[in-house]
């Protein structure tokens, strides 16, 4: 069994205690690694190291910070096979998908490095003669980055790269479900030659995470996680009025218009719902189909969902992999059972398979209602509830009648329909004739309970800055 060490102040170090967190492969349930259970003292030492390093890091010309990030991206790309192998074991992804995630993480790191010369301020006219107003962009300081289990490599760089180019230093807490890939990333950090303390990576329990996030030197907490995790982070932020950046839950609606290419739409929706067993915050979570094409579209969905086979992707990469844990599977199965009890029709799936691994079949439910739990709450699994509508206004109303507003999808061939939905949908993203993909030059930000702030692009990078107004009298 491999054993990892925390990465703090430029060194791989043993934790203060001899406690470890065991990591298992969700496809086999076999333990394969153990990672340190950092103590509050370990977390505070990491923040102290980051705070000390930030004083010099922030004063480096941004082009020099970019040079570090480019070397980091080179190291990530070179280490993609090792990062991918670790990620495949801890997540149940195929080695190819996991390695591609590492390569993509290198790409987003390069993208943010290229912002070095474009972190711009403003010159604002003054109302007073002989006076100028300068608005400057400055780093926040130490950023605590809390990483989810579903895309732990990409999401780590999605937060760390913009934080670093803006002049911040970081303390990263990976998910305890998928931490081993983070320590492979730590090796890439080391190979890139960052100054000690600029990047720190530690695994820990919730109590230690609280000590990390409430340290007075932490100026920002960046989380991708559940709504409940977001509420907890807001509590942490209260201690020192730290800035929150929260990418939280989603319940992506897909609206299928009568003129849509039904075959194309069905294939895309099933791929979205079964990629990584539906464990994506932007996966299709509810489908609204026009009455006139409902039966045809459901038949297409049923055939495609029934054809999806679950299994260990290390043995067969064409299969759908496992959920993250037994608890996640029990939660999802309970939601399906309650939906059927409330009147939904189970078209395919909906049973827990025998044998090892946290697998769950692609599951299609029809005759669902807007008030059902399966429509109102995030499943985060391969379950697709389908509802009918008769008018576009009704479909938009259903889509917007929700606590979440992260992403949304529309299939139509009519420009007027697309623009009507684009101007009315209550979500941070709308994808027309495709499913969500989060381009890193865009801005991934949710409405309502889906979050505060956002990731990606110019606006995602600026999340990691604060402003200073200089009023210059001459």
Regions found by a protein language model. Give the residues of each.
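Conserved C-terminal structural/oligomerization subdomain of aldehyde/semialdehyde dehydrogenase
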Residues: 26-34, 218, 255, 309, ...
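Short, well-ordered beta-strand elements within core beta-sheets of diverse protein domains
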Residues: 31-38, 53-59, 145, 254-257, ...
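Rossmann-like NAD(P) dinucleotide-binding subdomain of oxidoreductase/dehydrogenase enzymes
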Residues: 77, 121-264, 389
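Residue-level signal for inorganic ion chemistry
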Residues: 29, 65, 87, 109, ...
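Structural signal for hydrophobic packing residues in well-ordered secondary-structure cores
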Residues: 51-54, 58, 73-80, 84, ...
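Glycine-rich loop-to-alpha-helix module at the N-terminal edge of alpha/beta enzyme cores
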Residues: 30-119
């Amino acid at each position: 069994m491999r054993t990892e060490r925390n990465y703090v102040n430029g060194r791989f170090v043993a934790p203060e205690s001899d406690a470890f967190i065991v990591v298992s492969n969700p496809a086999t349930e076999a333990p394969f690694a153990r990672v340190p259970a950092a103590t509050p003292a370990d977390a505070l030492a990491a923040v102290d190291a980051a705070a000390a390093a930030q004083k010099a890091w922030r004063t480096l010309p941004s082009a020099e910070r970019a040079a570090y990030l480019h070397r980091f991206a080179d190291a990530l790309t070179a280490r993609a096979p090792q990062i991918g192998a670790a990620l495949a074991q801890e997540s149940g992804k195929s080695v190819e998908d996991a390695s591609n995630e590492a390569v993509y993480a290198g790409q987003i790191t390069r993208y943010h490095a290229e912002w070095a010369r474009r972190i711009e301020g403003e010159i604002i006219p003054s109302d007073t003669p002989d006076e100028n107003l300068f608005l400057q962009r400055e780093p926040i300081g130490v950023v605590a980055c809390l990483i989810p289990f579903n895309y732990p490599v990409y999401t780590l760089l999605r937060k760390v790269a913009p934080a670093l180019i803006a002049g911040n230093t970081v303390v990263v807490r990976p998910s305890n479900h998928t931490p081993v890939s983070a320590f492979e990333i730590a090796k890439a950090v080391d190979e890139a030659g960052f100054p000690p303390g600029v990047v720190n990576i530690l695994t820990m329990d919730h109590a230690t995470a609280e000590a990390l996030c409430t340290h007075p030197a932490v100026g920002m907490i960046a989380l991708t996680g559940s709504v409940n995790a977001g509420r907890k982070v807001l509590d942490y932020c209260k201690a020192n009025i730290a800035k929150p950046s929260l990418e939280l839950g989603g319940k992506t609606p897909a609206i299928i218009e009568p003129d849509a290419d039904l075959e194309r739409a069905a294939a895309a929706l099933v791929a979205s719902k079964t990629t990584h067993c539906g464990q994506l915050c932007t996966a299709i979570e509810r489908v609204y189909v026009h009455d006139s094409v409902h039966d045809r579209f459901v038949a297409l969905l049923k055939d495609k969902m029934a054809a999806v086979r679950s299994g260990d992707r290390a043995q067969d990469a064409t299969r759908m992999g496992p959920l993250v844990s037994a608890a996640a599977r029990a939660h999802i199965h309970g939601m399906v059972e309650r939906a059927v009890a409330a009147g939904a029709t189970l078209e395919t799936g909906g049973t827990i398979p025998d044998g090892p691994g946290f697998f769950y079949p692609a599951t299609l439910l029809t005759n669902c209602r807007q008030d059902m739990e399966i429509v109102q709450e995030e499943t985060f699994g391969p379950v697709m509830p389908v509802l009918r509508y008769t008018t576009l206004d009704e479909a938009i109303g259903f889509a917007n009648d929700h606590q979440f507003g992260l992403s949304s999808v529309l299939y139509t061939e009519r420009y007027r329909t697309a623009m009507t939905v684009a101007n009315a949908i209550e979500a941070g993203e709308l994808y027309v004739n495709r499913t969500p993909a989060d381009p890193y030059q865009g801005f991934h930000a949710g409405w309502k309970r889906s979050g505060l702030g956002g990731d990606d692009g110019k606006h995602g990078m600026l999340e990691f800055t604060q402003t200073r107004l200089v009023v210059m009298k001459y």
